[in-house]
Amino acid sequence: MMVTAVKKAFLCVALSVCLAGAARAADFYQVRGGIPNSQYFLKANVVGNQYLFFIGDSVLNGAGLKDSNLRYSNQMVQALQKHFPDANMHETRHMQPGGSWFGLYRVSHGQAVFGEVIASGHLAILDFAADDRDVPIETVKTSLEGLVRQIVLYRATHSQILVYTLTPEMLAAYQAGKTPEYIRVSEQIAEHYGIPSLNLAQYAAEKIIAGQISFPAISADGINPTDAGAKIYGEAVAKFVDALVGANPTPDKPVKRTLPAPLFAETNDNGRIVAYEDVAVKRSGNWKPGQASPIGPFRHVLISNEAGATLTMKFKGSEIGLIDVVDKDSAEYQYAIDGAAFQKLAAPKAVAGPTMRPVSLAKGLDRKAEHELVLKVASPGVARVGGFLLNGVVEDPTAKLSTLERIDATYAAMDPIVYQPPAGRFVNIPHTMAKLRDGGELRMVLLGDSIMGNTSGSSFELLMMRDYPKCKIIKIASLRSSTGCKYYRLENRVQDYVLKYNPDLLVIGGISNGGDAEAVRSVVQQVRAGKPDTEVLLLTPVFGSPHDEHIRTYTREIDTTTSNFRFNLQKVAAEEKCAFFDMTGPWWAYIQNSGKTYGWFMGDAVHANARGCQIIGHLLEMWFKE
């Protein structure tokens, strides 16, 4: 009996020790509300490519690694892939300086200069520990919280994860038995918003403190991990992801989040980059918009080499700053807020080459009051402006315009397109043209990828209905990211993506057909087999990367001497009795003749912005117009 009691007591103690050890092993991460919405999207797998956005600093770049695949961001994607093997995940890393302060502006509503909403998709992983080392903790509080709130405001179904990597300051705190102040504040924010967090700093520090490895072995420079350090991070990532995915069942549909009140009263969640071409920015003097930037992520910059050239902007907000490109030839600026004395923003003296410079000009402003910034070139040299960093709002004179009025305003600010469509182009779409001319309802299905999303976003059907007022066009965008006819032709997908919409006219386009005109033919034939009276219009590619074939090997007219997608698609159109529009030719000719860099028309590295969409929209209007 005594032995049994002792055994029981021993087992209880052992179990307690094991549980305590498990608790200690797990306290380097917190699951909180988890990422159930991302689990839904990863499992549903209906959007094509799924981009996981890692936003942070040099650690994401893999600096210091011999094997770049060991970076923790890649290991996190691979760990998620094990749970969702069919999801086409892409690790998308955004490494820029400025820590969470600049992150507040980067993770905004989409900027014409930066070109993309870098927290799009459904999951943002935020890692600013290294760049926030020297930032006052009060700034971190409001910047990180504002950033977290903006992501939810942008997309209420978005999931987030906070990650903390090891720094010398954090290690010193852990060695002293303390929680680093940065992590304490970040965890306050994570707890307030129910965001999962992964404390790689603690996981690595515990191994150093236990004597299992030295800090130099983990990181040669104190910030960026070595291969050995990255493997330790990878251990933690694997445990975290397993716990994260296992904590919540995958929901039947994503749930929109409602933001609580800010944790810190000073937090402002209106961070944005006001691009220099915004109507709120007034120019005087000699400025050249739409010029090529010597560095990314700018798509284009505003350039002046005239001392005295001035930019003025009225705004409401708590902080205003500047983002520009500086180099050895840069001019200095002077700036004034609300009529105060001008202050100097010096030209940099120690840059090795073109460098992005985000800088605050004034903070702590009355966010409800109207302010005015005046910025002027104040010395010989070159000014290369991207935009203004504003935690606040500017007046949008287009906000009350209708969609048609807005696209008219966009196009009015562009050089007009000169294009003469070919005769005989309507021969294979007689019923479509009859409905346009004579009236009735025209059901038009757009099939393709996100470039066809740009096509839909141009609202070209409104331009067409203005030309053909008797006809009501029902436009249906049936799209999947990075997806073309090589996908749609399989497994009877034409039923779900085309036939169920009962189209009168099917429009196939985009840049994701993989150069395979025969895949397009297969889709056309399957659609006609299911609904023989469907008319079809085939479009050649527009937009995309400069490395894509239709740009890299561009000719104004289709090259009929070699096998290329434009030529092959033209042959498919003729043989399958489809209408055909070689949009590539006039689209790229317009951009080449515009006097602007390609980025002037880009919304990101691949897609069109509002100007680019109106090239598409007005070309389609011209093609359909008799």
For each predicted feature, which ranges?
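N-terminal secretory targeting modules
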Residues: 1-55, 59-67, 78-89, 118-119, ...
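Catalytic His-Asp segment of secreted/periplasmic serine-dependent ester chemistry enzymes
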Residues: 28, 170-274, 544-626
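Loop/turn elements at helix/coil->beta-strand transitions in domains of secreted/extracellular proteins
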Residues: 48-51, 86-90, 119-124, 156-161, ...
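Oxyanion-hole/transition-state-stabilizing segment in secreted/luminal serine hydrolases
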Residues: 54-55, 61, 103-141, 437, ...
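Active-site-proximal beta-strand/loop segments in catalytic clefts of secreted hydrolases
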Residues: 55-57, 94-98, 126-131, 164-168, ...
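A short beta-strand-loop structural module common to alpha/beta enzyme folds
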Residues: 86-101, 470-485
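Active-site segments of SGNH/GDSL-like serine hydrolases
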Residues: 127-131, 148-184, 510-511, 528-566
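Charged helix-capping and loop-helix junction motifs
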Residues: 139-146, 179-183, 517-523, 565
